[in-house]
Amino acid sequence: MSILAINKSKIATNVWFDDNKMYVSLEDGRELSIPIDWFPSLRDATEKQRNNWRFIGNGEGIHWEDLDEDILVENLL
């Protein structure tokens, strides 16, 4: 018997927020919805601070300079 393993992308293409969640779009079309309560620095940040992010590692992670916060996409899966 053979086992088929599907390699899913762990590369982010976009990040946005509402009042309670962070959303992350992935290269393969998936969208993640993550409670910002999981990340106290994001939860307590201003809208301006939350929106001041950039990708690191070609989309493998997200960095917030103002908050000194890094999140790896694979840790959200």
What residue ranges belong to the model's regions?
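Motif-centric detector for short Cys/His coordination patterns
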Residues: 1-77
